[in-house]
Amino acid sequence: MDGYDGKFMITDLDFINILPQALLNRGIFLREAIGVYEIGWKFDDVIKVLDIIKEKEMMVLGGDVYELNGDEIIITYDSWSFSGSNFIKSFEKASEYINNYYENNGDDFIYTLIVSNTTK
């Protein structure tokens, strides 16, 4: 899947090669539920995912927030994006957005990440 200035974007299945199985097991695959090729994680887990992405020097191009209401996933239309070329700053923006969202809205949300495998 190409996009975002020609960088290769990571889809839900690509995360299988990047993340430990335990994090994948706790993720919520959104493909069947709402038709997007993303994985959502609760706050504590998405922070761990961000740390792994940072270690691998991958870019966080943005992300979306979904509300969990029992088994129902609700689109919140809340999101952020990053258009720079510094993977550290992309990580910082994602981390700041997610932390602020969690502090202001609580634990009934999951976060998806739009990630590129290149910092070029």
Language-model segments: what does each one mean?
Residues I98-K120:
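Acidic, proline/glycine-rich low-complexity IDRs
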Residues D2-F8, L50-E57:
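Short, mixed-charge, low-aromatic patches
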Residues M1-G40:
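Long, contiguous N-terminal structural blocks used for assembly/anchoring
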